[in-house]
């Protein structure tokens, strides 16, 4: 757990040659080609020890057992989107037995949750249009900037903090990235095709779209304006990796806050 919380221990950048040298039992060329990353030159291996164990398992477990495991994984992931018997078994184990829930949510709630998960920023645009006008965002941005200024003045006046520490604190405050209400640029879902053929088929296409969006980021600079939450999410977050804080529109509504 200590190592998992250490950002330095989880940053192990390697080129392909080093990757093959450190984990020679894994077929990296095939992996990158099938994954759509054949031109990727460098990767970060968050946990090298775990990767070694995975490579060893792949080379010691029989191919039939690996296929069986992947088949089970697919069925397990799809269960809540299939017929009633699959859905009931999935709920009975994961929700009733493991979590103590008494009954399944009504279908309309489950459907809304799925749409919210797949088309989060489409729903977000509708939510913002109705509940969070641009003027509310501008007021909140001004409020946060005032708080940043006030915090900077407090840091400068702290008697117990050393000057080098103050400099670091002010440097961090100056690079603080604030996200308020909703993204300035919405996601483009035009490549995602929604059909009336089957629920699961739409989930598959949504997963493929999500995967392609993720793969398209490989080898490119981090988009610091990308949101990790949707505007309609009643929550907020601070991301220490990018030194950013995010307040979605929904958390800026009564009873939490009133713009």
Predicted regions and their residues:
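Short amphipathic alpha-helical coiled-coil/interface segments
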Residues: 1, 140-151, 155, 169-180
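Noncatalytic, helix-rich "gating/capping" subdomain that lines the substrate-entry/channel surface
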Residues: 1-142, 146
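Long, compositionally biased
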Residues: 9-19, 190-211
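Amphipathic alpha-helical coiled-coil segments
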Residues: 157, 180-188
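Active-site-adjacent "gating/activation" loops or surface patches in catalytic cores
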Residues: 197-259
């Amino acid at each position: 757990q200590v190592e998992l919380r250490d950002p330095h221990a989880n940053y192990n950048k390697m080129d392909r040659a080093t990757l093959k040298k450190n984990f020679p039992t894994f077929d990296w060329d095939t992996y990158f080609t099938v994954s759509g990353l054949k031109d990727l030159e460098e990767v970060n291996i968050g946990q090298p020890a775990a990767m070694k164990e995975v490579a060893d398992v792949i080379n010691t477990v029989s191919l039939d057992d690996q296929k069986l495991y992947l088949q089970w994984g697919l069925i397990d992931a799809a269960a809540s989107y299939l017929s009633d018997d699959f859905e009931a078994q999935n709920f009975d184990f994961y929700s009733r037995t493991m979590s103590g829930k008494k009954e399944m949510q009504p279908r309309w709630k489950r459907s809304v949750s799925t749409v919210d998960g797949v088309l989060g920023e489409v729903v977000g645009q509708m939510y913002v249009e109705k509940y969070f006008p641009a003027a509310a965002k501008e007021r909140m941005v001004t409020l946060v900037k005032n708080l940043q200024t006030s915090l900077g003045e407090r840091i400068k006046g702290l008697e117990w903090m050393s000057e080098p520490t103050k400099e670091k604190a002010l440097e961090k405050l100056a690079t603080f990235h604030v996200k308020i209400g909703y993204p300035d640029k919405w996601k483009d879902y035009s490549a995602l095709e929604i059909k009336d053929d089957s629920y699961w088929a739409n989930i598959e296409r949504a997963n493929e779209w999500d995967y392609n969006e993720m793969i398209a980021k490989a080898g490119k600079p981090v988009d610091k304006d990308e949101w990790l939450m949707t505007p309609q999410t009643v929550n907020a977050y601070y991301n220490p990796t990018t030194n950013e804080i995010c307040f979605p529109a929904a958390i800026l509504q009564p009873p939490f806050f009133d713009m």
